[in-house]
Amino acid sequence: MNTVQPTDDKVFLLDAYAIIYRSYYAFLKNPRINSKGVNTSAIFGFVNILDELIRNEKPEYIAIVFDPGGKTFRHETYEEYKAQRQKTPEDIKNAIPYIKRIIEAYGIGIFEMEGYEADDVIGTMAKRLQGEGFGVYMMTPDKDYAQLVDTNIFQYKPRYGSAGFDVLGVEEIKAKYGLDSPAQMIDLLGLMGDASDNIPGCPGVGEKTATKLIKDFGSIDNLLHNTDKLTGALKTKVVQNREQIVLSRFLATIKTDIPIDLSIEEIKRKPSDTVKMRELFTELEFRTLLHRHQLGDIIVKQETTSHTQGSLFDTQAKEQTSAIQKATNESPKDTTDIIPTLKTINDTRHEYILIQTDDDIDRLIEILGSHSAFCFDTETTSLDTFEAQIVGLSFAVEPQKAYYVALPDDKQKTEEILRRFAPLLEDASIEKTGQNMKYDISVLGNYGIGVGGRMFDTMIAHYLLQPELRHNMDYMAEVFLGYRTIHFGELFDDDKTKKSGKPIEDIRKVELGKLKDYACEDADITLQLKNIFQQKLCESSLENLFFDIEMPLVPILAKMESNGVLIDDFALASYAETLKRELQKIERDILAYVDLPINISSPKQIGELLFERLRIVEKPSKTKTGQYRTDEETLQKLRNRHPIIKLILEHRGLKKLLSTYVEALPKLINPKTNKIHTSFNQTVVSTGRLSSSNPNLQNIPVRDEYGREIRKAFIAEPGCVLLSADYSQVELRIMAHLSGDRNMLSAFASGQDIHAATAARIFKIPLAEVTADMRRKAKTANFGIIYGISAFGLSERLDIPRKEAAAIIDGYFESFPEVKRYMEQSIEEARRNGFVQTLFGRKLYLPDINSQNASVRGFAERIAINAPIQGTAADIIKIAMIKVDEAIRRHNYRSQMMLQVHDELVFNVPTSEVDEFRQSVKHAMETAASLRVPLIVDVGIGHNWLEAH
């Protein structure tokens, strides 16, 4: 509970960058990217916080303060001030001009002062305004502002992870930090330091110790005058770091007397410029904000909207009546008002019809059967296809009109109704449209119902059009239709549920009228999106990729998920014990290098061990929180500095293997099938590769003995074997095709070992004289260069001097000159078009390809080189899967496709089919694409995945 006593005259001072950074990182795992590929996370988060403040407080006086950039007076005293901070992310740099324009459109003043930070400007403004009788609210999450809190000066702190603000006055600051006065925050920071600003503080003194010292001595000055009262190591730390403590206090002190001219009129908010706001929010695609501020166009409505239940049997003449009654519309009338940009079901004309009787079902089937295409969706009790029960079906054949078939709780009656729709759903002459159709196909499959005909999945269509963005229906409806869909939680009456959502299994408790609208809207909106995407696919020359590769793959993936794979859980349990013993051995080996117990799983303790006690490097890098970096990338670079690092890396690898796979896989076994059923994701990886989840089988390590052992647990069914078919060096073969390099084409055409042949050319020796080490280096170069590897990167990977790595790369390009030309052309094409594409027309967009930031641009250039290769490989294996599936159906094989992992397909094959099926798979995969070099597939057979691979 707040104990503040604010005055009626409030002034709000906002620390812009503190809020901008917070907003940007809040969306880091799921950034907001608009249709132009612009990351709007920082802008959207900042404006939402500003909006909430204005709605809650309606401030008359408000100012937003920016850091000016460049060095300040603190840098003149301490060069290392904020030196550890990473460069401002490119997306934040790009966001600042937009944010400033939006602030101006809100009628709010912007302040910044050369040589001073926003803290100092706000500190000075706060003290002056306090003296003039105002209540000052400093809006920032940063703790250093606590030192400014005083009578009528408050910290107005945005809550993390939820809406609202916490107002901190004197008593709240004292209670939060254990201080007698907010001003002591300066002394607290002086002792404990502040990693975010690289303020060193007193080494070895953390927040707890610093708080106790301030509690005991009152201030740093008093502490330094009474060091004789300290004892032991603490005394040594304080005495030896006296000057650093004083320096840290100086750096932590926010100035309150900088020379800034200020009048209250300058921070008085002016009227908003709604024209500018509309322009900016439209450009940024902030539809929620457009809706919130009612910034839509003024139009004349010719008639009121109808959102009542219509008749199933309405014809164009609107003459028929039925058991399902149609409510009449109001008389048309002219009204002029502002239409919010984001429409909803409440202000959009629609006709959503409930189907309950047998006659209605027959009539609906007749209507759907008379069309060449329809959209459908299932409403179910679970997102798990093995658990889901269908509670309803929705259909649409034209925009703004849809039908909902409500299914009873009775399982037998539900199955009877579904069987009536089966011929329609399985009809190959009728095109089916849906959103995430793999799910609907799987659920209907549980009832013995297939889905036939050409398919159009709006989720996959949007993925091809804009692979980097989100593909859920809610998002797409907002972007392409300016429409806000009904959210599941809104189907329930209580406010708490509306905000937090309800488990999907509670769908049977939803009032039927609401469920009808919700389900019909899904089918209706999906159909409207289909009409938009179909044209866009054509305009982008993506129709063939969509209809010939992506859509035929959908039912195949559904079938693979249903097939699942057997797991030997006893073997995994035994292997878990083996790994635990190995981990204990590594722990003993690590402890042999240290004289004190250590938690090997603690990055903090590992950092202190490596960089403070063992001092393996002079200037170790740190994270934003001031902790030593001990991530895998950092430790890999240091692995030869001390034997303990290799042990730490090995310990981490085994522990991850144990927790992520060995112990986790048995928990994912479906009790109904005794198999694991991974989910294959078609719209996640922008290059077109499939990913898998629950479990993720793409990341099972295969290069080391420990990781390979996990594959042993994937076993064949009784009377069967596992068959693994793996493309050999497919990405290099694609590089040879795309680049047309004669030397590379020749090596593949003659069937040479490509890595040995590469080594012979790089090192300018006969093929017979290539050593194993030379081949290893050439292999690393082969695969590294198609990912745009640098000399530094190659030297790190091969653990060789950079000069030698550079010589290898130079030798590579000298040997394969067309490869270098291809790489340059790919980058140039990306710069010119903003995208690159695969052999089959898949587009991969690169918004950062012309970035002014060299590292950001370099990353985009590497993607420009590799994405067409990786994407083409993804397209090829998808075509192969379609061809193999056709062979299985054509020959009535009992063999089942179970897994797809990168360039490998895994099948469960009855022993009686092995020889014939092996040839069918090999032929289908090797003829999936026609390249200038042959595609080669290695096929293996075994009782488990490891044996087969």
Residue ranges with predicted function:
Residues R581, K585-R588, A592-K646, E814-R862, ...:
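C-terminal polymerase-core module
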Residues E80-N94, D150-L179, K235-K237, Y403-R420, ...:
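Short alpha-helix plus adjacent loop in nuclease-associated cores
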Residues L13-L14, M138-T140, F374-F376, M455-F456, ...:
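Short hydrophobic beta-strand that contains or immediately precedes a catalytic carboxylate
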Residues T3-Q5, V11-F12, R22-Y61, E79-E80, ...:
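Conserved RNase H-like, two-metal-ion catalytic cores of nucleic-acid enzymes
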